[in-house]
């Protein structure tokens, strides 16, 4: 049986192959200024991911509006089984692999699976890994994460390899929304090298310079959220840095 990859994932893979990296903007549906944020980022992001760690209100309405405003692929990033709507294009179908609670490893995605099928949403199979200092953030608390220490990059690498063996095509290395510092470069590089699948990096990425480093280290996708909420104009410079790094990375790889 041939594995079917949907339209959204195919488009994202195309961007990564041709431009070296993609830029996702995370919009919390509970954010009061989501319309303003959506209007600004529509010319810079490659996709919008929609989700939050704690209770979501009016997800259908917000997702539909964001999709209409941006015209970009809208991908759900569900914090729980209630974080799914038929108004989106796709969903990050994920396992929080290093949670201490099996609910977040397997039960939550299993409970949401039938709804996803009913809505006809495209799924992007993904391992979600909580990296230090995620325990100090909302997702770390809610998800009961046994965070991976930054000084042990090989642990993230092994988890990423395991994810690839499970058939997942994406790994999200997450330091947490508003994290004090981002996932380190060595961890990103090892995770990419061992798994060979798409690596998403988010949390604590506040400057274009840091985003550039992460892409050059092996990240295929950079996610910003809190930064976008505080300074929507920052996304323009962030995109420039990510795309420059992507092309520089492709040139570097072509010489090997």
UniProtKB/Swiss-Prot annotation:
Pathway: Membrane lipid metabolism; glycerophospholipid metabolism. Disulfide bonds: none annotated. GO terms for cellular component: cytoplasm. Its cofactor is Mg(2+). Keywords: Cytoplasm, Lipid biosynthesis, Lipid metabolism, Magnesium, Metal-binding, Phospholipid biosynthesis, Phospholipid metabolism, Transferase. The keyword Lipid biosynthesis applies. Its EC number is 2.5.1.41. Mg(2+) binds at residues 28, 53. GO terms for biological process: glycerophospholipid biosynthetic process. Its main location: cytoplasm. It is an enzyme of class 2 (transferase). It catalyses: sn-glycerol 1-phosphate + (2E,6E,10E)-geranylgeranyl diphosphate = sn-3-O-(geranylgeranyl)glycerol 1-phosphate + diphosphate. SUPFAM superfamilies: FMN-linked oxidoreductases. InterPro entries: GGGP/HepGP_synthase_sf (IPR038597), GGGP_HepGP_synthase (IPR008205), GGGP_synth (IPR010946), IGPS_HisA/HisF (IPR050064). Signal peptide: none annotated. Sn-glycerol 1-phosphate binds at residues 172-178, 203-204, 225-226. One of its GO terms (molecular function) is magnesium ion binding. It is found in: Cytoplasm. Prenyltransferase that catalyzes the transfer of the geranylgeranyl moiety of geranylgeranyl diphosphate (GGPP) to the C3 hydroxyl of sn-glycerol-1-phosphate (G1P). This reaction is the first ether-bond-formation step in the biosynthesis of archaeal membrane lipids. Belongs to the GGGP/HepGP synthase family. Group II subfamily. HAMAP family: GGGP_HepGP_synthase. This is Geranylgeranylglyceryl phosphate synthase.
């Amino acid at each position: 049986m041939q594995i079917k990859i949907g339209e959204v994932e195919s488009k994202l893979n195309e961007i990564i192959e041709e431009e070296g990296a993609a830029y996702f903007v995370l919009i919390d549906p509970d954010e009061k200024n989501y319309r303003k944020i959506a209007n600004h980022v529509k010319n810079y992001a490659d996709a919008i991911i929609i989700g939050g760690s704690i209770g979501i209100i009016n997800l259908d309405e917000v997702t539909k509006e964001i999709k209409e405003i941006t015209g970009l692929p809208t991908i759900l990033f569900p914090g729980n089984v209630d974080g799914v709507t038929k108004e989106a294009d796709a969903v990050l179908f994920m396992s929080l692999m290093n949670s201490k609670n099996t609910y977040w490893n397997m039960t939550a995605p299993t409970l949401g699976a039938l709804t996803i099928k009913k809505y006809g949403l495209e799924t992007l199979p993904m391992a979600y890994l909580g990296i230090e200092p995620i325990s100090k953030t909302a997702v770390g608390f809610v998800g009961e994460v046994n965070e991976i220490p930054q000084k042990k990059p090989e642990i993230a690498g092994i988890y990423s390899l395991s994810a690839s063996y499970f058939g997942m095509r994406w790994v999200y290395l997450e330091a947490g929304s508003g994290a004090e510092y981002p996932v380190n470069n060595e961890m990103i590089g090892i995770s990419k090298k061992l798994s060979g699948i798409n690596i998403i990096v988010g949390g604590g990425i506040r400057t274009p310079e840091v985003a550039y480093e992460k892409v050059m280290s092996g990240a295929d996708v950079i996610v910003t959220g809190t930064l976008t909420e505080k300074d929507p104009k920052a996304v323009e410079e962030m995109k420039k840095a990510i795309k420059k790094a992507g092309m520089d990375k492709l040139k570097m790889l072509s010489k090997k």
